[in-house]
Each structure stands twice: as structure tokens, then as C-alpha cells.
Amino acid sequence: MKNLLYKELKLCVPLQTWIFIFLSITIMIPSWPSLVSFFYPLAGITVVFTLSNANRDLLYTSTLPLRKKDAVKGKVLLISFLEMISMLVSLPFGFLKLFLQKGLPEEQIYPELGFNLALYGFVFLVFGVFNLICFPWYYKKPEAKVTLPFLISDLVTILLISFIMAVFILFPEFASYVNSYELPNLLTQIAILLGGLLSFLGFTFLANHLAQTNFQKVDI
């Protein structure tokens, strides 16, 4: 699988996607909602599938000594890898956000999810939902236009992000709670992080299984 992931990275990830992946650094903007920074990587992932279709990547992969389900697994690994990269890249810039916020007047800092462990739990959830929608749908007709599966996936994740953001903006006490590192608050952050991680793993595993099932029915 390492070789397959390497092949995916070399042939299916254009410069535009890397730019979108690294836009998670916008988390450093003090007045910018932290969770929004992780929508950009998902927007860039669409380009991966567009390029794959343009290059007839599925046809090429089918000539390799691989099972059809391994071709799906390779793409799932690639997208999951890119999602993890976007999270890792954001970490130092999240700390920079906290530093920059210290110099702002209190009235310029509005209640939001902020930068903490809970944030990444929700990011895991958002990424998992995206994977669960887009992979099974895409692999029903992988060589058709890829617009609709990713348009719907992006729309659902935007709605999910908006809902999560709205909760913390409308209920400032929630924002204050998750941005505190006292023991009960920290335990809540850890619980949200673990819950999000389990959701991501479960949704992505299910997405991979459903996508493999759909792809087995496709005649390349």
C-alpha cells in the first residue's frame, strides 16, 4: 500500500491541491473562525479526482497487479493522508493565533470554537462526513463527471461547519468552556477529540467498504 500511496501522490495531486491543503494556515487569523480553515483542504481535494479522470488514472491502475478494491483503498488513503497533513500544518499557526489574540482588545475577540483539542475533534468529524458522502458516490460512476458528488459533499460539510460554529457563537458559555484548560474542561476537550477521531475512522472505513462494493460493479 505504501507504493500505491506513493503513486497516488506523484500522479494525482496537482499543485492546486497542495495550495488548498496549506490554506489551513488561515487558522492564525485572530478574527477568522477556526473551523472554516479546514474547509479549504476539502475544496482542493476535488481537483485530485478531476485530474485522475482527465489522466484516465483508473484505467492505468487497472493494468497494475492490484485488486479493484486496492485501487479504491489507495485513493482513500491518499485523501485521508491529505486531510491529516492539513491538520498537522495548522498546528503551529493555531498557537500563533493564540499569541496574536493576546494583543487584541477583548471586544474584538468574539466567542467561537477557537484553537484547542475540541476543534480537532470537530475537524475529524467534518472530514469523516465528507469521506462518507463522496467516496461511495464517486465510485458508483468513477469515470463520469465528478462535479455532483463533491458539490454535495462540500455543501453538507459547509452546513455541518456552520451549525457547529453557530452553537459556539450563539452560546458564548460553550466557547468559554472549551477554550479553558482547567481539568473538567480539558477532559471535555479530550472526549470531543476522541469522539471525533472515532467518527472519522468509522466513517472512513465505512466509506471505503461502500466504495469498494460500488466499484466492483463497474466495468472499466
Predicted features along the sequence, with ranges:
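Hydrophobic alpha-helical transmembrane segments of membrane proteins
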Residues: 1-58, 75-220
